[in-house]
Regions:
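Eukaryotic N-terminal low-complexity, Ser/Thr- and Lys/Arg-rich leader segments
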Residues: 1-34, 89, 336-343
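C-terminal capping/lid region of NAD(P)-dependent oxidoreductase domains
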Residues: 3-6, 300-307, 315-343
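Glycine-rich beta-strand-centered segment in the early N-terminal region that forms part
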Residues: 32-49, 58-102
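NAD(P)H dinucleotide-binding glycine-rich loop of Rossmann-like/cofactor-binding domains
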Residues: 73-80, 89-158
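Glycine-rich NAD(P) Rossmann-fold beta1-alpha1 loop
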Residues: 135-136, 158-168, 226
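Adenosine-nucleotide cofactor-binding segment
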Residues: 156, 172-232, 255, 279
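Glycine-rich phosphate-binding loop and adjacent beta-alpha segment
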Residues: 228-301, 335-343
Length: 343
């Protein structure tokens, strides 16, 4: 039986710097959703919170159009099909992945969905983490852009986050020396004891710069932070080093982001700094997921989720990504889904 109303969260105002309490607005609207031809009605169960979402709040040119004022906040997630419209290839009870947004229910066209069939050793939620965008970003960023080789030294910033922690693990699997950078002693301990990096460093430590220098120069730097961290790491390059420019989480809330000051080292060390977008590798997702699922199954790659309960908590949870409040993949549990879901 369908509810009489449902909740969704929309963009209320564009933040200049930090996400504020009035950035988003909750709406309770009548339930009048009905799938049309080639569409399905989905009950959202899980939503992914990712640093890229901060960029979607800016009214600026990017790889995706910005979320408009009054629109449901964009987010990827998992859901269960409640009803399939005429001509749909899906069936009620199937679990799907899509860009559902911050809402409890949504009508989505078939072409915008992926059916979730977890391989051995995996579970549906892994498609928001290791088998989803974070895992694929780590996989292709390190393999294609970083071109990491056995015996090389890899530094990873934002190492306790979803992407960073997976980069660390893939770096170890590739036979590299892995130095992880995080923002608390608890995260340092987790990275060394649970993730298995060679050394984890706390960037808030007064000895951080000297601690980095003790680890020698780097072959690959996987950058999730940008700003002062990137400028410092550009002074630590070996000849022919590669910088994988994945994100700049320290800059996303800045009204005037800092520019590069150490870029001349790219010339002197014949180094390369390259940005990338994981969507460009869509034709290779299946092969990457097969690898990652195998490693999940044999335990050589570990998963960690930071779970927030309830859709209404999403606006409060999103800023955690920019203050170091999460360890592992940050997700929102929206609902358990219907009892008939094929879990």
């Amino acid at each position: 039986m369908s509810p009489s109303n449902f909740t969704r969260i929309v963009l209320n105002s564009r933040p200049v710097e930090n996400i504020e309490p009035d950035t988003f607005r909750k709406e309770v609207v009548p339930f009048n959703l009905k799938p049309g031809n080639g569409q399905v009605l989905v009950q959202v169960t899980w939503l992914s919170l990712d640093p890229a979402m901060r960029g979607w709040l800016r009214d600026a040119r990017s790889y995706l159009p910005p979320v408009q004022i009054g629109e449901v906040m964009r987010a990827g997630g998992l859901g269960v099909i409640l009803e399939a419209g005429p001509g749909s290839k899906y069936k009620p009870g199937q679990i799907v992945h899509g860009i559902f947004g911050w809402t409890e229910y949504v009508v989505v066209p078939d072409k915008a969905l992926d059916l979730i069939v977890p391989p051995k050793g995996a579970e549906p939620l892994d498609f928001l983490n290791t088998l989803g965008s974070p895992g694929l970003t780590a996989y292709f960023g390190l393999k294609d852009v970083g071109q990491l080789k056995p015996g090389e030294t890899l530094f990873v910033s934002g190492a306790a986050g979803a992407v960073g922690s997976l980069v660390c693990q893939l770096g170890k699997k590739a036979g590299a020396k892995v130095i992880a950078i995080a923002g608390s002693e608890e995260k340092v301990e987790w990275l060394e004891k649970d993730i298995g990096v060679d050394k984890a460093l706390n960037y808030k430590s007064p000895t951080f710069h000297s601690d980095v220098k003790k680890q020698g120069y780097l072959d690959v730097y996987f950058d999730n932070v940008g700003g002062d961290m990137l400028n410092f790491m550009l002074t630590r390059l070996k000849k022919n080093a590669r910088i994988v420019f994945c994100g700049a989480i320290s800059e996303y809330n800045a009204s005037q982001p800092k520019g590069l000051t150490s870029y001349m080292n790219l010339i002197s060390q014949r180094a390369k700094l390259q940005g990338f977008i994981v969507f460009d590798y869509a034709d290779q997702y299946q092969a990457a997921r097969e690898d990652m699922a195998k490693w999940l199954g044999d335990g050589s790659v570990k998963r960690k989720f930071h779970i927030v309960e309830g859709l209404e908590q999403a606006p409060k949870a999103l800023p955690m990504l920019f203050t170091g409040g999460n360890t592992g993949k940050l997700v929102v549990k929206v609902s358990d889904g219907p009892a008939k879901a094929n879990l």
